[in-house]
Amino acid sequence: MPLTPPPDHSITYRILAVGLCSCCAIYAATRSTLPHTGDNLHSLPYGGKYSDGTKSICYSGPGPTPDIPTHLPALLVLVLVVAIYASSRLDFSVNYRCSCRVHNRSGQ
């Protein structure tokens, strides 16, 4: 009885990962996280005005969140880019660049 290697399941795992990511992306894109406004028949999640003979509702919709400034994400990206650039230029007494001439043998 010859020994055989176990089957390769990497493609199966890759397909499962793509399917799971697709399901999560579709779920996140179709889920509404807006607050519920109105009654069981009339929903105004984006704001609006409704009135009939017995009831009326006026809702202006969700506004921007005042606790996070609008320029903060751009500022964080800029700080990260500058930090990465500065860390690549600083000398931490470790030479990561190859200074040997093994790859440059044009004289031979």
Curated annotation (Swiss-Prot):
A GO CC term attached to the entry: host cell endoplasmic reticulum membrane
InterPro entries: Plant_vir_prot
Lumenal side: 32-67
Further facts: TGBp1, TGBp2 and TGBp3 seem to act together for cell-to-cell propagation. TGBp1 is the main movement protein that physically cross the plasmodesma with the viral genome. TGBp2 and TGBp3 would facilitate TGBp1 function.
UniProt topological domain (Cytoplasmic) ranges: 1-14, 86-108
Subcellular location as annotated: Host endoplasmic reticulum membrane
Keyword Membrane: yes
Family, per entry: Belongs to the Tymovirales TGBp2 protein family.
Protein name per UniProt: Movement protein TGB2
Cited function: Plays a role in viral cell-to-cell propagation, by facilitating genome transport to neighboring plant cells through plasmosdesmata,.
UniProt keyword annotations, A-Z: Host endoplasmic reticulum, Host membrane, Membrane, Transmembrane, Transmembrane helix, Transport, Viral movement protein
GO biological process: transport of virus in host, cell to cell
Transmembrane segments: 15-31, 68-85
Record organism: Strawberry mild yellow edge-associated virus
